[in-house]
Amino acid sequence: MLRDAIKQLPTFAARTYKGGAVMREFLGEQNARDNFYPEDWISSFVTAKNKVYVENEGITRVEYNGQIRLITDVVSVEDFGQGRLNSSVLIKLLDSAQRLGIQVHPTTEFARDVFNSSFGKTECWYILGKRSEDASVYLGFKEHVTRQLWAELFQKQDIEGMLSCLHKITVTPGDVILVTGGTPHAIGEGCFMVEIQEPSDYTMRVEKVTVDGEVLTPKQIHYGAGEDKLLDCFDYTPRTLDEVRSEFVLTPTRGQNGQLHLVKYSDTECFALSLVDGCDFGEICPSFVTVIVLEDGGEMLCNSKEYPLKRGEKYFVPANIEYKLKDAKALLCYPGVKGIKK
């Protein structure tokens, strides 16, 4: 079992869209450029599902006893917390220089029945920044959309037609957007965010060619499940824009210890997310906690060890270990509670 926090190192994963320059600057890289590694996977025990398999791609690298190790080699089940057999969460920094393809992630039930997976992929976006004033996301079907219409647009590969079926929401730093499994969505160009999600990498895509012109394989589109199952994955509930905002855009609430609760377990059982901004905060959490430092300054105390904090640093704090944040601005990411043994 771990007795101290461990520092996580940048762990970039290949994706089908270009980005990452803003993210890399946030992480301290000089002269950063966009490429096809636009995500940094944090507290990740999940291997990336890509066109070409790369061993351990996506598994977070950490500093441990002066060495660079995989988090899977350092963290034990006991470090997750009582009743936990796995991490129950995956966290990413994500920076889009291009619009991501229109997509959907499976619900828990769909993932179990179709992919034999214990986890679907409900996720949440916390917007850190944007490259332009009109940076946006697409979310939820408009009122006129039916499965038949969606299937016709998919077969025609009418991309503009499919985009017009989704609500477009301009984002602002500090926005918190919950995307439940089955909800159609696409992250637009110029969004920099923390994405917290269930620990899987299942993405069903309806665009067969990426924005950059790459032709996707059937495996990349639906993992061999077939186009009918791909269409089954979508929730065809029609919504007005006001309904989308009410259901998916969360309103943070202030906690007793000064932290801002961005995502609560009453919002979803899949994860929780809080923001500490300058207040002194401490806890002994029954689960592990992931700390993402948003600004230089302040410190973390963990089991009497001091950690001066810099922007872009990420820490894994094991379960049942006291930690304190002083004069820091940081996100606190918590794993899900669904199915946890008492």
Range-by-range predicted roles:
Residues C270-D277:
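A surface-exposed beta-alpha-beta supersecondary segment
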